[in-house]
Amino acid sequence: TFINVKCTSPKQCLPACKEKFGXAAGKCMNGKCK
């Protein structure tokens, strides 16, 4: 699932994923968090 968060590194996805899914995990793919 891609979320609308721009990123350059996976670290930027952690807070956003935690907010949306309650799990602090994420990858940065094509400039967006997954």
UniProtKB/Swiss-Prot annotation:
Coiled coil: none annotated. Transmembrane segments: none annotated. It is found in: Secreted. The record marks 27 as: Basic residue of the functional dyad. SUPFAM superfamilies: Scorpion toxin-like. Expressed by the venom gland. One of its GO terms (cellular component) is extracellular region. Keywords: Ion channel impairing toxin, Neurotoxin, Potassium channel impairing toxin, Secreted, Toxin, Voltage-gated potassium channel impairing toxin. One of its GO terms (molecular function) is ion channel inhibitor activity. It holds the Pfam family Toxin_2. Potent inhibitor of Kv1/KCNA voltage-gated potassium channels. Has the structural arrangement of an alpha-helix connected to a beta-sheet by disulfide bonds (CSalpha/beta). Belongs to the short scorpion toxin superfamily. Potassium channel inhibitor family. Alpha-KTx 02 subfamily. This is Potassium channel toxin alpha-KTx 2.6. It comes from Centruroides limbatus.
